[in-house]
Amino acid sequence: MSAVPFSKISTPLNALFATIGLLVVAALTTQGLTGQERLVFELLLAAIWLAYVLQLSGTLLSRRRRLSGEMTALVIDLLAVLVPAAAFLFVGSRDRDLYCAIWLLKPLRDSTFFRLLAKVVANESRNLLGVTSVFGIVLFGAALAGYIIERDVQPDKFGSIPQAMWWAVVTLSTTGYGDEIPQSLAGRVLAGLVMMSGIGIFALWAGILATGFYEEVRRQDFVRNWQLVAAVPLFQKLGSAALIEIVRALRPRIVPAGAVICRKGEVGDQMFFIVEGRVTVATPDHPVELGAGNFFGEMALISGDPRSATVSAATEVSLLSLYAVDFQILSSSSPEIAETIRKTALERRGGPPKE
C-alpha cells in the first residue's frame, strides 16, 4: 500500500490512535502485568508507531503542495515518530513507553484552533494584560495582608510574604481553602474577599477571550462569505457597499453530491447561487446542468410561484442562499441589488425586464 494515503489519516482517526496509545501507556504503568500482557501492549504501541511512520512518509512525499500550510502537521508527525524512537534507543526500558505521550499532539495536527487562539490573544493582548496586572496587584496585596494578619498566629505558614503568597495564589484560583487556613476572624474575612476577587478576575479573563473568539470567528465568516459573493458573476459589477449588504443577507450552504436541493411543486422561500460544483435541473425535455456562477430558484422570490423543477447536486456543491425575507429587506435598503436579480431572472426566462 502506498504511503501517501496515510498522510490523509483523518483527525478522528488520529484521535483514536492517540487515545489507544495513551491508554496503553497508562496500562503499562500499572503493577502486576504479566510478561505476555506487557508484550501485547508493546506490540500495540509499535503498530501505532508504524502507522504514524507511514503517515509521516506520506506527508513528506506530498511536499509539492504549499509548505507553510502543512508545517504544523509536519512538525507534529516528526515528533510523533522521532520522540518514541529516540526514547527506545536512549532511555531505559522502564520509562521509554512514557515518551509515547507525545501522541497527545496528533489530534491537533489538522486543527485550526491554535491559529485562531493566537489571533484572539494578539487582538485582545492589551485587555488580557490589564486583567493580568489586576491579578498581580490583588495577589501581592492578599499575600501582604495575610502576612500582617496571620504571621503571629501561624508563623510556619504566614511567616513571610513569599509563604503567604502561596496561600494567596490558592485562594485566588479556587473557591475554598487550600492547605493553609487562616485562623483569625480577620484572616477569614480576608480569605472571603480574596476568593470573590478571584472569581471576578477569572470571569474577566473568560469574558475577554469569549468575546475575542466570537469577533474573530465572525470576521473570518464575513471574509469567507465576501470571497464567495465576489466569485458570483452577477455581483461582480456591484460596489463594496452593495457587496456588504449581500454578504449580510446571503447564507453559505454545502450540499453533498446526490442530495435534492429543491423539488418541483414546492413553495419556495429562497433562491440559490452556485459558488462551486454543479447541480442538475430536471427539466421536462432533458436534464440541464448548472455550474459555478449560475443561480436558480429566483422566481420563488420574484413572483412567489412554486418550484418549476427539481434540482439536485451533481457534485458536492457550495451554495449561497437568499431567503425571501432577506430579498425584501435588500429591495428596501439596496434597490439596485434586487433590480439586478429581478432583471437577470426575467431575461433568463425570455421575458422583458420590468422597468
Curated annotation (Swiss-Prot):
<keyword id="KW-0631">Potassium channel</keyword>
<dbReference type="GO" id="GO:0005886">
    <property type="term" value="C:plasma membrane"/>
</dbReference>
<comment type="function">
    <text>Cyclic nucleotide-regulated potassium channel activated by cAMP.</text>
</comment>
<feature type="transmembrane region" description="Helical; Name=Segment S2">
    <location>
        <begin position="39"/>
        <end position="61"/>
    </location>
</feature>
<keyword id="KW-0630">Potassium</keyword>
<feature type="topological domain" description="Cytoplasmic">
    <location>
        <begin position="210"/>
        <end position="355"/>
    </location>
</feature>
<keyword id="KW-0472">Membrane</keyword>
<dbReference type="InterPro" id="IPR018490">
    <property type="entry name" value="cNMP-bd_dom_sf"/>
</dbReference>
<feature type="topological domain" description="Periplasmic">
    <location>
        <begin position="31"/>
        <end position="38"/>
    </location>
</feature>
<dbReference type="InterPro" id="IPR018488">
    <property type="entry name" value="cNMP-bd_CS"/>
</dbReference>
<keyword id="KW-1003">Cell membrane</keyword>
<feature type="topological domain" description="Cytoplasmic">
    <location>
        <begin position="112"/>
        <end position="128"/>
    </location>
</feature>
<dbReference type="InterPro" id="IPR000595">
    <property type="entry name" value="cNMP-bd_dom"/>
</dbReference>
<dbReference type="InterPro" id="IPR014710">
    <property type="entry name" value="RmlC-like_jellyroll"/>
</dbReference>
<feature type="short sequence motif" description="Selectivity filter">
    <location>
        <begin position="174"/>
        <end position="179"/>
    </location>
</feature>
<keyword id="KW-0633">Potassium transport</keyword>
<feature type="transmembrane region" description="Helical; Name=Segment S5">
    <location>
        <begin position="129"/>
        <end position="149"/>
    </location>
</feature>
<comment type="subunit">
    <text>Homotetramer.</text>
</comment>
<feature type="binding site">
    <location>
        <begin position="297"/>
        <end position="298"/>
    </location>
    <ligand>
        <name>3',5'-cyclic AMP</name>
    </ligand>
</feature>
<keyword id="KW-0114">cAMP</keyword>
<keyword id="KW-1133">Transmembrane helix</keyword>
<dbReference type="InterPro" id="IPR013099">
    <property type="entry name" value="K_chnl_dom"/>
</dbReference>
<dbReference type="GO" id="GO:0005221">
    <property type="term" value="F:intracellularly cyclic nucleotide-activated monoatomic cation channel activity"/>
</dbReference>
<feature type="topological domain" description="Cytoplasmic">
    <location>
        <begin position="62"/>
        <end position="73"/>
    </location>
</feature>
<protein>
    <recommendedName>
        <fullName>Cyclic nucleotide-gated potassium channel RHE_CH03180</fullName>
    </recommendedName>
</protein>
<dbReference type="InterPro" id="IPR027378">
    <property type="entry name" value="Nucleotide_channel_N"/>
</dbReference>
<feature type="binding site">
    <location>
        <begin position="307"/>
        <end position="308"/>
    </location>
    <ligand>
        <name>3',5'-cyclic AMP</name>
    </ligand>
</feature>
<keyword id="KW-0406">Ion transport</keyword>
<dbReference type="InterPro" id="IPR050866">
    <property type="entry name" value="CNG_cation_channel"/>
</dbReference>
<keyword id="KW-0547">Nucleotide-binding</keyword>
<dbReference type="GO" id="GO:0005267">
    <property type="term" value="F:potassium channel activity"/>
</dbReference>
<keyword id="KW-0812">Transmembrane</keyword>
<feature type="transmembrane region" description="Helical; Name=Segment S1">
    <location>
        <begin position="13"/>
        <end position="30"/>
    </location>
</feature>
<keyword id="KW-1071">Ligand-gated ion channel</keyword>
<feature type="topological domain" description="Periplasmic">
    <location>
        <begin position="180"/>
        <end position="184"/>
    </location>
</feature>
<dbReference type="Pfam" id="PF07885">
    <property type="entry name" value="Ion_trans_2"/>
</dbReference>
<feature type="transmembrane region" description="Helical; Name=Segment S4">
    <location>
        <begin position="94"/>
        <end position="111"/>
    </location>
</feature>
<dbReference type="GO" id="GO:0030552">
    <property type="term" value="F:cAMP binding"/>
</dbReference>
<feature type="transmembrane region" description="Helical; Name=Segment S3">
    <location>
        <begin position="74"/>
        <end position="93"/>
    </location>
</feature>
<dbReference type="Pfam" id="PF00027">
    <property type="entry name" value="cNMP_binding"/>
</dbReference>
<feature type="transmembrane region" description="Helical; Name=Segment S6">
    <location>
        <begin position="185"/>
        <end position="209"/>
    </location>
</feature>
<dbReference type="GO" id="GO:0044877">
    <property type="term" value="F:protein-containing complex binding"/>
</dbReference>
